[in-house]
């Protein structure tokens, strides 16, 4: 009788522990993560254009200062893309350039698609 009572008590204890672990999991997923979200918001860069304007104004460039990258180049269409790992640069015939997403295409494919679009074929 004592063994049965001990077994039942042990089973209830294990069940309660497992249930508590499940509720902690759901609490963390749906409500307990608020503290983590608060911490990540404190680390974000403030949405303030004053930093960019100060950096732009203090940049020294005797030629053309690219507004997107703050690179100093000879002419505007030589400006590099802001995200070269995921963008291809395509120089247009009028002395300007655009950066387009590579989108998983092979090298040069984005530029080919831009050219097709300019001709009205895409």
Curated annotation (Swiss-Prot):
The keyword Signal applies. GO terms for biological process: ERAD pathway. CDD domains: LCL2-like. It comes from the Eukaryota. Residues 1-21 form the signal peptide. The keyword Signal applies. InterPro entries: LCL2 (IPR034543). Keywords: Signal. Probable component of the endoplasmic reticulum-associated degradation (ERAD) pathway. This is Long chronological lifespan protein 2. The lineage of its organism: Eukaryota, Fungi, Dikarya, Ascomycota, Pezizomycotina. The gene is LCL2.
